[in-house]
């Protein structure tokens, strides 16, 4: 065709040491490929903090890693299990921080919850 689909993921901060941003971009590319019946070999990550755009090759290895994560998520869903999440300093910059479940599950036991409630009064 006349057009090529190229996903660009905008991030507020700066590049991370882990591959989470690349995995997110890869997952988006995979969804777009299915929706638009096309191949997406490349995408970009734009970081607001550094005002820099980084080219990302959408490789078979990254696609396989995304599929592996999808399978793991589906297994959790089938078991009706929600894994615990550890809050980190990056949680404060997350767009979902006000709706996030880890805050709800911070008290590990009923006893800890009751003690916390009594201490607040």
Residue ranges and their predicted role:
Residues 24:
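Catalytic-loop motifs flanking and including active-site residues across diverse enzymes
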Residues 9-18, 55-60:
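Short histidine-centered catalytic/ligand-binding loop motif
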């Amino acid at each position: 065709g006349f057009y090529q689909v190229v996903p660009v993921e905008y991030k507020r901060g700066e590049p991370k040491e882990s591959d989470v941003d690349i995995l997110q971009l890869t997952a988006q590319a995979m969804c777009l490929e299915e929706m638009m019946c096309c191949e997406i070999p490349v995408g970009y990550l734009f970081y607001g903090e550094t005002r820099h755009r980084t080219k990302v090759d959408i490789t078979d290895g990254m696609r396989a890693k995304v599929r592996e994560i999808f399978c793991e998520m589906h297994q959790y869903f089938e078991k009706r299990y929600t894994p615990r999440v550890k809050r980190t300093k990056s949680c404060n910059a997350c767009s979902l921080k006000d709706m996030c479940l880890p805050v709800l599950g911070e008290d590990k036991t009923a006893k800890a919850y009751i003690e916390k409630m009594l201490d607040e009064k």
